[in-house]
Amino acid sequence: MKKYLIILAVLAVVVMISGCTTTSNINTKNFSTSGMSFQYPDTWNVSSQVNNNSTQVMVASPEFISSNATKGSVLLIIKLSKSGDNNMSQTRQELITQAQQSGQNATNATINIAGVTASDISYTGKDTTGNNTYGRLIDFEKNNSLYLLLFASGGGADIDAVKPYFDVIIKSFNVE
């Protein structure tokens, strides 16, 4: 019995050291406009523009801002009034085709966001200078509006490190 307790104690220490029991704690701020709201990392910058038929929100990492958009991570959120001209299925297919033709790894899935099932396309690859790049498009319709969330990271930014920051926004994104 003592042998099992020692083994369990060692396993518990290994799990605690490896971080398997801790979660990432990212400090956030709240943002709300045009019936959408979300949390975002408190070190990031948010700007928005509201027009008659659309709302654009940009959420940018400090690295993106300080490099004049040559390195870092950014999210562009676009809300459009639904019309017959909006054809996201064609846009999705074009994005996947372009990613695959340029040798990038593209995935096409769905995700639950803002209480609906949304299209979720992501890709990883290299830019023209050999830096890792990451892009993601989440789009959905709700309340007669079309929502597009366009994530991008590149220029040598640490893509794996930024994904939890993007996840904070995705998990908290809400539409009235």
Language-model features, listed with the residues they occupy:
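N-terminal targeting sequences that direct proteins away from the cytosol to non-cytosolic compartments
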Residues: 5-66, 109-110, 127-129, 143, ...
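Conserved polar/disulfide-associated segments of primarily extracytoplasmic proteins
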Residues: 50-149
